[in-house]
């Protein structure tokens, strides 16, 4: 299964966290460094092997159409936008343009796939308009998946992860609210 992520910020952290979790379950290919553009994504796909059960691909964009191109290459089973911010604002003519560019990630998701959207983002409605899959989950405040009972310790974080399937306690080995 291919999981593709994009967003204005937090892509690399999210990719690394998800890749770390999936690597415990099965062999997983994870985008290295910032090989997340129209040159880096094909390079990463060349590393995909038969033993990989998962691929966590970070898709970045510095121009319109780049995520459409890379999403078409990876054909994700799960695709998600982390947020719509102001990175590369000039190249896209404003946050509306950034939203359109990031939403290209849903253009090539497999028909039975799952789309993930940020519930609390100012552009959540704009993002949702681009979703083509039946299965769509939102995360964050007001979403289908959200955290409660967040406790920050000096070297770790603990919280309850609420999902449509139930609630699980999560312990992260680092401090901070992410």
Regions found by a protein language model. Give the residues of each.
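Short gly/Ser/Thr-rich phosphate-binding loop of adenylate-forming enzymes
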Residues: 121-122, 152
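Phosphate-binding loop of NTP-binding sites
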Residues: 1-115, 119, 125-132, 163
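Adenine nucleotide phosphate-binding catalytic loops in nucleotide-utilizing enzymes
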Residues: 95-96, 135-178
């Amino acid at each position: 299964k291919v999981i593709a992520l994009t967003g204005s910020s937090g892509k690399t952290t999210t990719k690394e966290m998800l890749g770390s979790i999936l690597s415990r379950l099965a062999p997983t290919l994870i985008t290295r460094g910032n090989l997340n553009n129209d040159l880096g994504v094909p390079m990463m796909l060349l590393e995909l092997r038969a033993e990989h059960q998962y691929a966590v691909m970070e898709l970045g964009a510095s121009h319109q159409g780049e995520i459409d191109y890379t999403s078409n290459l990876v054909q994700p089973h799960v695709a998600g936008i982390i947020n719509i911010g102001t990175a590369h604002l000039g190249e896209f003519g404003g946050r509306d343009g950034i939203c359109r560019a990031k939403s290209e990630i849903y253009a090539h998701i497999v028909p039975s796939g799952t789309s993930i959207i940020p519930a609390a983002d100012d552009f959540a409605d704009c993002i949702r308009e681009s979703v083509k899959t039946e299965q769509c989950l939102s995360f964050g405040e007001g979403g289908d998946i959200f955290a409660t009972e967040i406790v920050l310790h000096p070297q770790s974080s603990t919280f309850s992860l609420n999902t449509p399937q139930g609630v699980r306690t999560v312990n992260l080995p680092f401090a901070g609210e992410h």
